[in-house]
């Protein structure tokens, strides 16, 4: 019987567990190549620390938070984890307080930063100077090559299946277009909620995945209103909608009274000012206030099998086990 060694895993006998081996696990010194996606208003230091305890990389969101609140979240993660542990902060370049948040990130010596919603290139030098790894989110092949050449430590390739602000190309098409030209760790994102998605991404050549929506149902995601969690549990694959596609600022979330009204206005030719006024404050209203009809609950497309709230550790264990089964089955195909 011929034994086929899977290079993604190595066996640690003393712990009786599988240790994953990808470019991303090496870069971030984590057990599993899973990054928890940053989510505005709700990704704090408690969730990020829980992700690290589970062997993954948690990310503190800066969207919706002041610079002082971001600092508090970073210090919460430090207090829980201690020094030398892996967590990150998301830097939203369109945010009005981006300079203040970036200064906090540098002052606190955050291990890594995910960068989105703007041109990441000018930020590499000051962040690298502070000893911080830079992982920009990219929506196309051209930008992926540019950020690699400019010194990005890794990239997150995010398909239109992702919740929140997203692009116009599916994840699989992006991976097909980008993977052949990228040597740094590539993280797949958008619509991945289980081990099947992780396995598919790794088989295609990604070094890891970013998952946001799955961790909305984590017990440690304590800032998300219970009503919003229940709305996600109740949702299925046809409940995912994109608002703002015609404006160039697409946002994906759960269909409800707000999204129906917005889409009616958008595709009736309403001016941008009307659409902006209509959507203002809806993210917070849905996520924090729990208004599931007049707020917008941001979530990705893969919703059908998100049916229960679990601790982060349990979620990760389920994902890891399913990934390993899928990869084992894939090895039998040829």
What spans do the regions from the language model cover?
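Residue-level detector of alpha-helix initiation sites
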Residues: 42, 192-193
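Short, Lys/Arg-enriched N-terminal segments with co-localized hydrophobic residues
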Residues: 1-17
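Conserved active-site-proximal phosphate/metal-binding subdomains
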Residues: 173-183, 187, 193-334
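Acidic, glycine-rich active-site loops and adjacent beta-strand->loop/helix elements
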Residues: 95, 160-161, 191-192, 214-215
């Amino acid at each position: 019987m011929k034994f086929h060694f899977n290079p993604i895993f190595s066996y640690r006998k003393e712990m009786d567990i599988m240790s994953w081996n990808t470019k991303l696990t090496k870069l971030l010194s984590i057990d599993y190549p899973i990054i928890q996606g940053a989510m505005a208003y709700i990704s704090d230091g408690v969730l990020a620390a829980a992700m690290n305890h589970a062997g993954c990389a948690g990310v503190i969101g800066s969207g919706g938070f002041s610079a002082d609140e971001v600092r508090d979240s970073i210090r919460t993660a430090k207090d829980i984890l201690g020094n030398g542990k892996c967590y990150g902060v998301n830097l939203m370049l369109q945010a009005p307080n981006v300079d203040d948040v970036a200064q906090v990130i540098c002052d606190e010596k955050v291990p890594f930063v995910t960068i989105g919603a703007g041109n990441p290139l000018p930020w590499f030098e000051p962040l690298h100077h502070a000893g911080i790894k830079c992982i920009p989110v990219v929506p196309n092949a051209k930008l992926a090559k540019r950020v690699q050449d400019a010194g990005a430590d890794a990239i997150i390739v995010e398909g239109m299946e992702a919740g929140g602000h997203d692009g116009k190309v599916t994840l699989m098409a992006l991976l097909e277009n980008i993977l052949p030209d990228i040597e740094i760790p590539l993280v797949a994102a958008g619509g991945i909620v289980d081990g099947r998605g992780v396995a598919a991404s790794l088989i295609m050549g990604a070094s890891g995945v970013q998952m946001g929506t799955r961790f909305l149902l984590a017990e440690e995601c304590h800032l998300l209103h219970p009503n919003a969690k229940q709305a996600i549990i109740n949702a299925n694959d046809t409940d995912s909608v994109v608002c703002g596609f015609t404006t160039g600022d697409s946002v994906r979330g759960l269909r409800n009274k707000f999204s129906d009204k917005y889409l009616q206005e958008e595709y009736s030719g309403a001016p941008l000012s009307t659409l902006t006024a209509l959507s203002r404050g809806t993210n917070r209203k849905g996520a924090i206030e729990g208004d599931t009809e007049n707020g917008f609950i941001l979530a990705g497309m893969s919703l059908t099998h998100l049916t229960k709230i679990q601790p982060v550790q349990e979620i990760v264990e389920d994902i890891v086990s399913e990934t390993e089964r899928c990869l084992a089955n894939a090895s039998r195909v040829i």
